[in-house]
Amino acid sequence: LRQSQFVGSR
């Protein structure tokens, strides 16, 4: 899981 996706999920 990339940090970019994690941030976008927020």
Swiss-Prot record:
Alphabetical GO biological process terms: neuropeptide signaling pathway
Q: Which residues carry this modification: Arginine amide?
A: R10
To which species is this protein native? Urechis unicinctus
What lineage does UniProt assign to this protein's organism? Answer: Eukaryota, Metazoa, Spiralia, Lophotrochozoa, Annelida
Localization annotation = Secreted
Gene Ontology cellular-component terms for this entry are: extracellular region
Q: Which domain of life is it from?
A: Eukaryota
- Function per UniProt: Contractile action on the inner circular body-wall muscle of the animal.
Q: What is this protein called?
A: Urechistachykinin-1
Keywords associated with the record: Amidation, Neuropeptide, Secreted
